[in-house]
């Protein structure tokens, strides 16, 4: 049975734990790791059948087959290279870290060198399968428009640096428009989907992103438009925010669980 270690015990990490604990996913939940030991222990204590240990990252890496990162972009930079060198497969949720070309090349190189797999869930959007297919023929443009309630954008580096008072917004306001390479740094906890789209499509510099704060919204809305030699397609998702973290869409957690199921399933459906 696949032994899994989860790094990051927030909403997404918790949902994955509960999916394994409830028998929805047939795997061994071996260990948890979080910058807050108490948070990891609290999550472990809430489970009914699984009894994962709390471990420091070095110990966790030595004991598992698959690490699921659901912590932060900094965690990706620090943990994933170590895991790959140790022969662990890794699922990355904080995909925005890979906007760093040097890090991206390092991780892809290590995965190849050590015969490991890197998994990137679709996250809070749909259409990644179509984007993968379209890239085989050639894509001319990819645009992502993300609209969120102001509360879901609080604390983002871009918001803080520009002194934007989100709580005072009375109408829909465009906060950012530019390449995905800049968007994932400006809003690291909000637009990981931009990174996933970039990896599947035409890269971080050519993928265009617009981030909008909309006080009339109660959901996170992601719209993607893709054009190329295949034709054109568009997708729209209205996600309910996580009840624990308004910056995270519930669908992102479900996507991680689905990716884990796909890893374990001998039958693969879709691109």
Swiss-Prot record:
UniProt key word NADP: yes
Domain of life where this protein originates: Archaea
EC number(s) from the headed UniProt entry: 1.4.1.21
InterPro entries assigned: Asp/hSer_DH_NAD-bd (IPR005106), Asp_DH (IPR002811), Asp_DH_arc (IPR022487), Asp_DH_prok (IPR020626), L-Asp_DH (IPR011182), NAD(P)-bd_dom_sf (IPR036291)
Class of enzymatic activity (EC top level): oxidoreductase
GO molecular function: aspartate dehydrogenase activity; NAD binding; NADP binding; oxidoreductase activity, acting on the CH-NH2 group of donors, NAD or NADP as acceptor
Entry binding sites for NAD(+): 124, 192
Any one GO biological process: NAD biosynthetic process
Catalytic activity: L-aspartate + NADP(+) + H2O = oxaloacetate + NH4(+) + NADPH + H(+); L-aspartate + NAD(+) + H2O = oxaloacetate + NH4(+) + NADH + H(+)
Claim: ATP-binding is one of the keywords in the record: no
Pathway given in the UniProt record: Cofactor biosynthesis; NAD(+) biosynthesis; iminoaspartate from L-aspartate (dehydrogenase route): step 1/1
Keywords assigned: NAD, NADP, Oxidoreductase, Pyridine nucleotide biosynthesis
Active site: 222
Family statement: Belongs to the L-aspartate dehydrogenase family.
Note from the entry: The iminoaspartate product is unstable in aqueous solution and can decompose to oxaloacetate and ammonia.
PANTHER family in alphabetical order: ASPARTATE DEHYDROGENASE DOMAIN-CONTAINING PROTEIN, L-ASPARTATE DEHYDROGENASE-RELATED
Main function: Specifically catalyzes the NAD or NADP-dependent dehydrogenation of L-aspartate to iminoaspartate.
Protein's UniProt name: L-aspartate dehydrogenase
Species: Methanosarcina acetivorans (strain ATCC 35395 / DSM 2834 / JCM 12185 / C2A)
Lineage per the UniProt record: Archaea, Methanobacteriati, Methanobacteriota, Stenosarchaea group, Methanomicrobia
